[in-house]
Amino acid sequence: LGLLVIDEVFDGWREKKTDYDYRQLFDKWRFYDLDMMLRRDRNHPSVFCWSIGNEILERKSEQAVQWAREMRDYIRTIDRTRPVTQALASWDNDWEIYDPLASQHDIVGYNYLIQKAESDHQRVSWRVMMQTESFPRDVWRNHKAVEEHPYVVGDFVWTGIDYLGESGIGL
């Protein structure tokens, strides 16, 4: 069995997702925690990519672009061999508003939005994309996207099983 790991340091940054999430620690501890993850995992052969966030809520802000740039640059001081990503998700009609944030990543992570790949490629031809979360029911469609478009480099299914955290999502 071979596994590919996207090593993700934060589920959120400064905006509240839950009562006890990382937002209260982000300003003071983000670089320390990022450094600890990088140094702990940099020799693991399964880790192919570093992720600096998952569906962060402040993704439209200029401040988020700055934080992403700072974290990406910091990662590159420790490990220049692996790409940096972040899982972006949106249910807005103005997906293009995320282009400044997406431009801070080597691979742009799309959660449930790989159908935007072709139009995004036409708009931003240099962008490399992967689906960082997808439904199991979409695995064949997503596999075809990887096969047909060289700028789509993979698909990660979330999740193939049901569990208490998000029951029903594995269907």
Predicted regions: what they are:
Residues 1-118, 123-126, 133-136, 140:
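Active-site mouth of glycoside hydrolases
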Residues 84-86, 130-131, 152-157:
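Acidic/polar loop patches that form or flank catalytic/metal-binding clefts of enzymes
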Residues 126-127, 148:
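Glycine-rich, phosphate-binding/catalytic loops in enzymes
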